[in-house]
Structures are given as structure tokens and as C-alpha cells.
UniProtKB/Swiss-Prot annotation:
Record-annotated site: Cleavage: 86-87
One GO term of the biological process aspect: proteolysis
Subunit structure: Homodimer.
Domain of life: Bacteria
Function summary: Represses a number of genes involved in the response to DNA damage (SOS response), including recA and lexA. In the presence of single-stranded DNA, RecA interacts with LexA causing an autocatalytic cleavage which disrupts the DNA-binding part of LexA, leading to derepression of the SOS regulon and eventually DNA repair.
SUPFAM superfamilies: LexA/Signal peptidase (SSF51306), Winged helix' DNA-binding domain (SSF46785)
Record's keyword terms, sorted: Autocatalytic cleavage, DNA damage, DNA repair, DNA replication, DNA-binding, Hydrolase, Repressor, SOS response, Transcription, Transcription regulation
Major enzyme class: hydrolase
Source species of the chain: Syntrophobacter fumaroxidans (strain DSM 10017 / MPOB)
Reaction it catalyzes: Hydrolysis of Ala-|-Gly bond in repressor LexA
Descriptive protein name: LexA repressor
Matching Pfam families: LexA_DNA_bind (PF01726), Peptidase_S24 (PF00717)
Assigned protein family: Belongs to the peptidase S24 family.
NCBIfam families: lexA (TIGR00498)
Length: 206
């Protein structure tokens, strides 16, 4: 079963923290590093991960009691197509590269990956340098996070359509949405997953 982007961020942080330190992060460390406003959000996502068989809590009411459970799905290589803006739209650069992702992260059909540039989606937990996993599709529902082309330039935003007008809304209260006619916006795909490398290993794209 696919995880939500927020669940993937929590799982990825816990996994990388355990690999680096040999023990699990505290709930407060998860909250601070992933930008959640409250511990309740952390508890909610961890409970969902536990229900789906990704983690388990060894001791109740302990700060560092998380254990990763073995995953029964392998890694899948998908195309890595360059950089997408989480700010002002920029052109996505196609390069001969690929990235391996957990099979459980993928949607049905054609998937690809893009690196985020900018911080307009920061309030959704999407940071500069993150790798987005995108399911290629030409339609989206209101409220979905999409990769879209606006006059040929790629951007990642929240999608809303009212009649013939499309609003691409940032998740950053300091930034303004993009408004355009429907015929000027091409939805490339919807964001179905996110990878974050805390060691900031380069994939060859600046």
C-alpha cells in the first residue's frame, strides 16, 4: 500500500537516523526536523506507519522506542528527469539518470522523479533538494500536489481549477499563487512520494 508524502518523510527520517546513530530518534527530534507544528502530528503518522507494518513501538511511553520492520517490497529504478521549481517556474532539464525508490512508493502506471528547487511548498514539508516521485497523468483533482507546465516551464504546486481558470497555489504564506487559463497549463503528473537524503548526496543536478 502506498504511503502519503508525509508518512514517507517520517519513515525516511526514522530510517536514516537509525542507520546513522544506531537508535531511533525521539518524537521531538522528528517534529523539529520535519517541521511539524505539534507532537500530535508525529504520533498520528507513526501510528499509521505502525498499522501498515513499517515500524513498531517496542516500549510504550518511551522517547526512543521505534524499530523498523522488514519491508517485503524491493527497490524500483525510475527515470530522474532533472529539477522542478517550488517557487518561480523553471525549465525541467531531462538528463540520462535514474533513481531507485521503494516499490511501495509508486503509483500504478508511469512514474518519474524530479529534484525540488525553491521553498514555496515548505509548509507541505517539501524542501529544496528533496526528490519527488511523480505519477505521470494529465488530470488532477483540486487540492492535489502536481507538477505542471506553465508556458513550457515546470513547477510544483497545489492544483485548483474553477471553470477555465487554474490556480497553482504554493504552500508558503509568503508567496503568491499562479493564475492561468486552463489552456495555458499542462498537468504533467501528481506527486505520490518524496525522498530526502540527509547526507545531501548529489544526483548530478544543481
Amino acid at each position: 500500500m502506498n504511503l502519503t508524502p508525509a508518512q514517507e518523510r517520517v519513515y525516511g527520517f526514522v530510517r536514516d537516523y537509525i542507520q546513522k546513530n544506531g537508535y531511533s530518534p525521539s518524537y521531538e527530534e522528528i517534529r523539529q526536523n520535519l517541521g511539524f507544528r505539534s507532537l500530535n502530528a508525529v504520533f498520528k503518522h507513526l501510528k499509521q506507519l505502525e498499522q501498515r507494518g513499517y515500524v513498531q513501538s517496542l516500549w510504550k511511553n518511551k522517547k526512543r522506542a521505534l524499530e523498523l520492520l522488514p519491508l517485503h517490497t524491493g527497490a524500483v529504478s525510475i527515470p530522474f528527469l532533472g529539477v522542478v521549481a517550488a517557487g518561480t517556474p523553471i525549465e525541467a532539464v531531462e538528463i540520462p539518470e535514474s533513481v531507485e525508490v521503494p516499490e511501495s512508493f509508486l503509483a500504478n502506471g508511469n512514474n518519474f522523479a524530479l529534484r525540488v528547487k525553491g521553498d514555496s511548498m515548505i509548509e507541505e514539508g517539501i524542501r529544496e533538494g528533496d526528490i519527488l516521485i511523480v505519477a505521470r497523468q494529465s488530470r488532477a483533482e483540486n487540492g492535489q500536489t502536481v507538477v505542471a507546465l506553465v508556458q513550457g516551464e515546470a513547477t510544483v504546486k497545489k492544483f485548483y481549477q474553477r471553470g477555465e481558470e487554474i490556480e497553482l497555489r504554493p504552500a508558503n504564506s509568503r508567496m503568491q499563487p499562479i493564475h492561468a487559463r486552463a489552456d495555458a497549463v499542462e498537468v504533467v503528473g501528481t506527486v505520490v512520494g518524496l525522498l530526502r537524503n540527509y547526507r545531501r548526496r548529489s544526483l548530478g543536478v544543481v
